[in-house]
Amino acid sequence: MNRLFFSKIALWLLDFLTFNISFLLSLFVISYYHNGYEKYLPIYEIDDRTYIHAVLAGICVGWFAIRLRHYTYRKPFWFELKEIFRTLIIFAIFELAIVAFPKLYFSRYLWALTWGITFLLFPLARVLVKKFLIKSGWFLRDTIMIGSGDNAFDVYNALRDEPYLGFQVTHFISVSNISNNVKELNIPILNSMSSWTSVTKKTDQFIIALEDDEEVDRNNWLRYFSTNGYRSVSVIPTLRGLPLYNTDMSFMFSHEIMLLQMNNNLAKLSSRILKRTMDIVVGSLAIIIFSPVLLYLYFAVKKDGGNAIYGHPRIGRNGKTFNCLKFRTMAVNSKEVLDELLRTDPEARAEWEKDFKLKNDPRITKIGAFIRKTSLDELPQLFNVLKGEMSLVGPRPIVIDELERYEENVDYYLMARPGMTGLWQVSGRNNIDYNTRVYFDSWYVKNWSLWNDIAILFKTMNVVLNRDGAY
């Protein structure tokens, strides 16, 4: 417990120091490039400005601690990052008002540089320190999973995908049936009161992740934890399929009823305009930045005599067909090569019928293998984005034959423009099965937000650089 307490103190001190270091670092940068900072901050005001910034740092850290509970509750990385940026924006505007109204000397350059460094340094420092604390074992929390079914397995995977939470699942406690997925994890599974009380502590994190038909067991566990002094208990009900990101929650007084107000953000005109604006602005900038790469690949692919770019029919928003642009990565006679392979190789035919992809595809050219591995074959889709046929982020563009495989989720797919990248691309790409791809596409549409798009774009950069799941 002491280690966890000191981890909280370390995070608190780090945030306070980072906040102040950003101001001092901005003064250093200005001094280095402008032979002193007096032009941007008079010497007689430096003490006042340092004091103001230090007070703001204390208030900001207090806000993180008391209102947002960043040092007591553990939150998923992207959710916490959104709260950090939102808070820093508020405090940046607040400092602007404090400095401007008392008629202190105000430099927009110093203000912008200070907060620009803060926005960069603050989350980076959080990640690095959490990474260090987890690696040293100080921030790790032994976690006991109540349940051993599909819900418990889903929760385990979610925790594994959020390493900075520091939850380390050490045991499962079985209530009824044990799923094969849980068995394959090789994590101890306990099934009696005496067995789990002897290996756990009241300070451990307990997560109740039972199935819908185990409501009685769930209530019994909650009653036991509440009456026996267990404080770190979380309940994760089975809510698969609900649009949780856009849900407002309220409670009925004196009733054990929770009201979830569902909101479909992509159905709002304002949300669609916002998403389209980001597509146009970011897409245009990307074309300008990557224009040398586009030109080089165009001529490199064209060397074998075929077209460098081809358009393949895909299903877009509202079922409208469009030509999805890509650099050609296959031989000119790729159709004949595929037909012959499927006719003579039963294993390849089975793989193709399952996922419409081949891991060892003989149609791919040498330059094609490179640009596929680096995902550069999809760069021409930036023009699809500008035309309004695609979005930077969205469901994976599919052919018409794949629509039937979406079954009841097909309406979600048709609600949004297909994306150059999406949850599928940042979650394993070709290494995941088709049903999981469908799940990711429907989850994205149901839970859309501009912040999710930004998070997926940053995740895509990491995937492309590491070449995860591409072939």
Swiss-Prot record:
One of its GO terms (molecular function) is phosphotransferase activity, for other substituted phosphate groups. Keywords: Cell membrane, Exopolysaccharide synthesis, Membrane, Transferase, Transmembrane, Transmembrane helix. It is an enzyme of class 2 (transferase). Coiled coil: none annotated. One of its GO terms (biological process) is polysaccharide biosynthetic process. It is found in: Cell membrane. It is a multi-pass membrane protein. The chain crosses the membrane at residues 10-30, 46-66, 87-107, 280-300. GO terms for cellular component: plasma membrane. InterPro entries: Bact_transf, EPS_sugar_tfrase, Undecaprenyl-P_galact_Ptfrase. Belongs to the bacterial sugar transferase family. This is Uncharacterized sugar transferase HI_0872.
